[in-house]
Amino acid sequence: MKLSEKFCVFLFFLLFTSTTHATGIGSLKSFMENARTVRADFAQTVLDKSRHIVQTASGAMQFERPGKFRWIYEKPYEQLIVGDGERIWFYDHDLAQVTVRKLDAAIGSSPAALLAGNNDIEKNFHLLEIGLQGNIEWVEATPKTRESTFERVLLGFTLEGILRVMELHDNFGQVTVFEFSGVEQNRKLPPELFKFSPPAGVDVISE
């Protein structure tokens, strides 16, 4: 099964904050203010509505505000997603195909909109403090618009304010879980990471 673009496109701005906070909402708001660049590894698990595992994947990502990111799936399939600040490029190595979209159209009212760029989180999302479970503080973000692909997003922060887990709950009962490790925050990233030119011979589809 190929990895679904709808899960990839919402995750490029997922970063981490190292500031200590007492609540999930406080950590989320601090993340919005303080996370400028990030490099991290991720493990992804997709669960169906019966909570059976239907897909796993892993890879790495880099991010630089505003709107620049590089998201690499290494297993089970090679896929590359690059945001250059204006467009998002999806490159599927096996299919020899590139899909390109405008950044605003691709993100919309989504988890990326929740985490990207400005601090006006509650303009587009209802935030609910879930509380401490184990050593993780959880916050729930629900889109105010009915046009969102996702019903809700759960964000889990450590007690030190580091974002470790994100769960995307879609409108069909499917859940995509991302767990993050090897976080490097606010380091200078090479500009070339956020540029993409389609390889020769691949099909390019504009949406």
UniProtKB/Swiss-Prot annotation:
Could you name the domain of life of the organism this protein comes from? Bacteria
Matching CDD domains: LolA
Kindly list the places in or outside the cell where this protein is found, as annotated in its UniProt entry: Periplasm
Coiled-coil segments, which residues? none
Cellular component annotations (GO), alphabetically ordered: periplasmic space
Q: What is its main location?
A: periplasm
Q: Which SUPFAM superfamilies match?
A: Prokaryotic lipoproteins and lipoprotein localization factors
**What NCBIfam families does the record tag this protein with?**
lolA
Under the subunit heading, UniProt states: Monomer.
Q: PANTHER family from the xrefs?
A: OUTER-MEMBRANE LIPOPROTEIN CARRIER PROTEIN (PTHR35869:SF1)
What exactly does this protein do? Participates in the translocation of lipoproteins from the inner membrane to the outer membrane. Only forms a complex with a lipoprotein if the residue after the N-terminal Cys is not an aspartate (The Asp acts as a targeting signal to indicate that the lipoprotein should stay in the inner membrane).
Q: Which HAMAP family match?
A: LolA (MF_00240)
Could you tell me what this protein is called? Outer-membrane lipoprotein carrier protein
In the UniProt record, the gene name given for this protein reads lolA
